[in-house]
């Protein structure tokens, strides 16, 4: 995140098995790291995701992570650590656009029925390396830097939605890098 310094993780997983036994998993020098498809995220301004960099199976048992680097132990941030309890974000309804206007060969303007906070779920088809830019615009026609970028993996229909951001908007300007891209669906998750 642009406002948080170097990315860090402090984690403690408390696992309780069905037989009643427990296991504690904590961050230490046995953890590994690598780059992936999420190139940038900022809660208020958006995400950049390159699907060509996805690591198939990385989250399944038996994945070969021999090329991954050991995570570095780093200094703790200043201040004291306190638990923060907050409700998780959840989808309460899904909106379809009320209109779509093609501005030129590569730009589309989607209008939604009201100003909302949420994110877009896209379903597209194109070639590896094709890019989609989603610019989220409010009623006053200002985007306040709210942009999501998605680079296609290629090879079929792809679906994507950001995981670490949400936007406040009424319109989405969608710009595609190539005119052969096919938008199958654009919906809003609120």
Cite the ranges covered by each PLM segment.
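Extracellular/oxidizing-compartment recognition motifs
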Residues: 1-182, 188
């Amino acid at each position: 995140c642009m406002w948080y310094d170097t990315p860090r993780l402090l984690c403690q997983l408390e696992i309780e098995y069905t037989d009643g036994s427990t296991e504690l998993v904590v961050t230490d020098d046995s953890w590994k790291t690598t780059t992936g498809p999420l190139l940038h995220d900022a809660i208020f301004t958006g995400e950049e995701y390159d699907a060509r960099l996805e690591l198939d199976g990385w989250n399944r048992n038996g994945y070969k992570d021999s090329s991954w680097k050991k995570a570095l132990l780093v200094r703790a941030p200043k201040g004291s650590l306190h638990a923060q309890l907050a409700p998780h974000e959840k989808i309460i309804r899904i909106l379809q656009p009320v209109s779509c206007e093609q501005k030129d060969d590569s730009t589309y303007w989607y209008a939604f029925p009201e100003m909302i906070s949420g994110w877009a779920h896209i379903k597209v088809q194109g070639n590896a390396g094709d890019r989609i830019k989603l610019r989220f615009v409010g009623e006053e026609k200002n985007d306040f830097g709210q942009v999501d970028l998605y680079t296609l993996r290629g090879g079929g229909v792809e679906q994507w939605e950001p995981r670490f951001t949400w936007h406040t908007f009424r319109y989405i300007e969608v710009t595609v890098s190539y005119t052969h891209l096919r938008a199958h669906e654009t919906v809003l998750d609120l």
